[in-house]
Amino acid sequence: MNLHLIWATLIGAVLGSLADWLFAGVLFHGRYQVHPEVWREGAGGQRHRIILAQALALVTAGAFVLLAWKLHQTDYKGALKLAAMIWLIGPLPVLLANALFIKIDHLVTASHAAGWLVKLLLIAAATAWMLG
């Protein structure tokens, strides 16, 4: 297996995790309590949930890297376009549909949507850097 695929995945996962931290953890942090009944109570299981979320970031990065490699979209232009298309197909519609039916502050939804776009673009940049 090409070692560059692994490096692209690891770098993409780290960058994606930083995007998650900023857009889902820092921006509009106080707005999460506009509808506190939506969120799980207590901080007891947060560490476990954070570890699982980081594992998902690794899966996201790995899947993106492999898809870009398989589709021969490993240059910057191709990888960034692929990231934007994935965002339009997956995270954006899901987040907007959730906002229609779940009481989530609109700024939180916007932050999560922007975070997903940035995460995918960063993974794309890591992919192009390592494989392009």
Feature-to-residue mapping (PLM):
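Juxtamembrane/disordered regions of integral membrane proteins
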Residues: 1-132
